[in-house]
Regions:
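Sequence-level motif detector for i,i+2 pairs with an aromatic at +2
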Residues: 3, 29-32, 61, 82, ...
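A generic structural motif
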Residues: 95-98, 135-139
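Non-catalytic DNA-recognition/assembly elements of restriction-modification systems
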Residues: 1-42, 138-160
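A structural detector for beta-sheet-dominated domains
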Residues: 9, 67, 134-136
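A short beta-sheet element
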Residues: 47-109
Length: 160
């Protein structure tokens, strides 16, 4: 399998969450996941109601969430398939080529960057954009998304 190094900024549009409500201000409910700086539970700190969240603060799903800081979670990523609420401890990456299979694959690659970040060094927007991703390529110099999909569906890559 041939790979090429891409930077996050070449694959994703990076978006900062717009949310300003803290955990205590959120109304408990089942409408939206509140995605925070944690790796466990796919980054979901709690479920909340949409009742006091402006619609402009709700992030679209089908996103890679980059955890910038947190209790040992800085440098991790999660894939969020559905709309969610988040605040400034994370940054979101969007791509029209992203789907659930590619999201899982990219999270597994991106999480290898965890070793570079901690309480002393957060994964800020600039560092996120410059983060390198080794991705499979075919004859054209862009990621081979069909191969990524088949690896996730088929459970791996076999060079026969």
């Amino acid at each position: 399998m041939k790979t090429k190094i891409f930077k996050v900024k070449d694959i994703f549009t990076i978006v900062n969450p717009k949310g300003h409500l803290n955990t205590k201000q959120l109304i408990p409910g089942d409408d939206l996941p509140y995605v925070a700086a944690k790796k466990t539970n796919n980054g979901v700190a709690k479920m909340c109601s949409k009742d006091n969240i402006p619609t402009t603060d709700i992030m679209d799903g089908n996103a890679i969430v980059f955890i910038q800081q947190g209790d040992g979670s800085a440098g991790y990523t999660t894939y969020q398939p559905k709309p969610f609420y988040a605040i400034s401890c994370v940054t979101c990456g969007y791509s029209p080529r992203l789907n659930d299979k590619r999201g899982l694959y990219l999270v597994s690659i991106l999480d290898k960057n965890k070793v570079f970040y901690s309480h002393a060094r957060s994964w800020n927007r600039q560092l996120i954009q410059e983060t390198e991703l080794p991705l499979p390529v075919s004859t054209v110099p862009s990621p081979d998304y069909a191969l990524i999909d088949s690896m996730i569906i088929g459970g791996g890559y076999r060079n026969e």
